[in-house]
Each structure stands twice: as C-alpha cells, then as structure tokens.
Amino acid sequence: MLKSLSLSALSTIALAATAFAAEPAPSAKNGMFVDAKGMTLYTFDKDAAGKSVCNGPCATNWPPLIVADNSKAAGDWTIVVRDDGQKQWAYKGKPLYTWAKDTKPGDTTGDGFMNGVWHVAKP
C-alpha cells in the first residue's frame, strides 16, 4: 500500500512538473494558437487584462503556458507574472493555458467549458 502511494505521489509530482514546463512563444495553426507540442491554447473570461486568476486546482486542470527563460515579449505577445511568481505567456494581455483533458494536438475539448468561460485562443 505504501509503495503504491509513493508511486502515485511521484506520478503526481512528475505530471505537475511537465504541465508547467517553460515554452517558447506560441504559434498559430489551423486558425488557433498552439504551444510547442501543437496543443491547443485557451483564454479564460475571468482573467483581467495582464492578470491570471487561474491558480491552484484551476491551474492543475488548465496549465498556464509558462515562458521559457530566454523568451521575450514582442508585439501582441506579452508576459504576465502569476501569483506564484512564474511568468506566463499572454496574447493581447489575455493569459494563455492548455487544457489537461486535451490528449493530442488539435483537440479542442476545453472550448466553451464551464458555461462558456474558456475559449480557444485565436489570432
């Protein structure tokens, strides 16, 4: 039992570490923004311009797109500082996220989630 709990804890830590991995600036593909792995990016209506309010369990389900150390904001691409101090990519001031339930590039299962407050990020 203890061994399976330890494996479960390690899996959770590994998942959290990969979910918040640093990324270069997003790109557009098929009319929507995607991360470096081709996963769909989303915006959250409850975020204020330049401020993410998706923290804790929200950020577990909607991992923020964390800025790689060598990346710089340019044009409509901005960087916001999260409550935990991490830097997150934003487009026109709207923080960007992936969705934990999207399993492959091109999935858009988070679009319209939670009574329509989550949206696919588009150019």
Regions found by a protein language model. Name each.
Residues 2-4, 20-123:
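Compact beta-sheet-dominated domain cores in extracellular/mature segments
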Residues 8-16:
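Bacterial N-terminal signal peptides
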